[in-house]
Every structure is written in structure tokens, then in C-alpha cells.
Amino acid sequence: MRTIIACIVALLLFVIAVVIYGVVHNQQATRTGSLCAEYGIPADDPRSNPEPLPETDETGENREVAPDNSIKMNQPLDVHGIRSRYHVFARGVDFSKPVGVVMRLHGDGAYEYDHPEGLLNCMASVAASHNMILVAPRTPDHEGTRTWWENIGESSVWLSGLISQLREDYGNVDTHNMWWMGYSGGAELISYGLLAQEPENITAGAIMIGGGGAPTDKPDPAPALNARLPLYWYVGSKDNGKDPRSTFNALNAANNGAHWYRSRGYDNVQEYVMDGDDHFSIPQAKILDDVLNNQK
């Protein structure tokens, strides 16, 4: 009898162990497959599962810093009275070697900035694999929807100050190897303002995702300065403004922006329409990785 009871107990313990293992394994598999896969990084890629970020909130009052200073969240910056904040992701970057910069501008409303644990953390993982820090600023526009493009002059002044701050904080960061990547309204700022007015700040290239229209009231840029500058436009084939979640016709904007710069002497303009993607599904982390790989 005791032998039977012992066997039953052993069997129950074995079943419990199998169940626990299955739950843990499924949780790990879910995490592995869900963190960065939706942004285009395969689940079996080590970069698809970055470590969690320091705790933050949407108020912008906290200034969380990782113990090794590899991640800085919500850092305040005042540039001639223009105030905003920014995140810096430097985890996994080797500062004994040349370090580049990816400056990533959020879309209207700053959702990505307020929720950095998803897309931004995955993009930082990609940037680090190219030995680049990821900088994610928040627009100094504090009214309404919070956009970059409604006050291009103020946004540009503040971003120039941010570049100076990065040089001061990270002396060996090469701001001559700075890629700008803008999504939606962030792409509009790059194409309307920075490329047309301050091309000297875009030293390595620019990536416009889900936007990036043609300037309408700006003088033509000097193509002799940046004729070979790589300019990329990526937009989803369904990003045509018919989705009630996004009435902005990014397809037209991207086409117009790419044509405008190409017609003004920029001969390294590339435009990609992502089949089946809309304004929200376009794989931004993969795009960043693909573009940086193309420069090697």
C-alpha cells in the first residue's frame, strides 16, 4: 500500500513539475516572440529580447538612470528657454570604439516617447548592434497633440541644443555619424525643416517612415552639400488616409517628399512601399537595421 501511495505521490509531483515547466517555457516563448518581433526583428534574433528599461511614467517628472548610466530616461534640457526632455539608450555600446548616433523623432502625440519599453527599447537594441546610441527626444511642443512640425523653428533650435548636449555628455560620440529617423509627424519635421533648413545636422542620412512630405514654403536646399546623403522613405501600401485611426495620407506625402528632394539634386534617394502595411504595422526596427546594414 505504501508503495502504491509513494508511486502516486511521485507521479503527481512529476505532473506538477511538467505543468510548471510548461507554463514557464510558454511564458518565455511568448516573451521571446512578442517583444520585438512585431517591429520586424525575428524571435530567434538575440536583439529581439532586450532587458527591461528603468521604471518611468508619463508625467516626465522622473529622471530614471540605469546604474551604469547606460540608459537615461526623461532627461530635461533647456535651450534658450525652450524646454523638453529626452531618452538616451547606450546599453551594449562599446565606447572604446567609434560610436554613432540614431536620433529618433516620435509621431504626433509622442506615444512612443511615453511608452519606451516597446518600440524604442527594440530600436535601441538594433542601434547598439551597430555600436550606435539611440536618442529619443520629446517635442518641445507642450500644447494640444504635441507635434514636431507645427513650430519647426522652435523644434529645430531645441534639437540643435540637444546635439550640443550629447557632445558634452558623450565626448567620444561621433555626431558626424548621426542618422535621423522620424515616424509620421517626426518624418515631416525632417523633410519640411531639418533637411531643407539645417542639413548640416543630418550628417549620415535620414529615414522617413509613414510621412516626410515636400516642403512648400522653403528655399531649395544646397544639393552640393548633401547630394550623396542617403535619404530613405518607407511607407505602408495601406497608409493612404482611409484608415479611421489615421486619416493622414502618408503614401502621398512620402511620394511627394522623395520626388521633391530627388528633383533638387539629391541622387541617393530611395523610396519603399511596404506591401500590406498600414500606418501602425510598418516594421520600424527592421527598417533601421536594414538601412544601417546597407551602409557597410
Model-found features: residue ranges?
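The feature captures the conserved acid-bearing segment of alpha/beta-hydrolase catalytic domains
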Residues: 204-285, 289-293
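Loop/turn elements at helix/coil->beta-strand transitions in domains of secreted/extracellular proteins
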Residues: 97-101, 129-135, 174-179, 199-206, ...
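Short substrate-entry loop that stabilizes the transition state in hydrolases
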Residues: 94-145
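Short, flexible/disordered intra-domain loops and linkers
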Residues: 112-117, 144-151, 240-252
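Cell-envelope and extracellular/periplasmic
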Residues: 105-110, 167, 183, 190, ...
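Alpha/beta-hydrolase active-site loop
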Residues: 148-172
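Primarily recognizes the serine-hydrolase "nucleophile elbow" in alpha/beta-hydrolase
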Residues: 169, 176-226
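A domain-start/cap signature at the N-terminus of enzymes
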Residues: 4-8, 13-101, 193, 256-259, ...
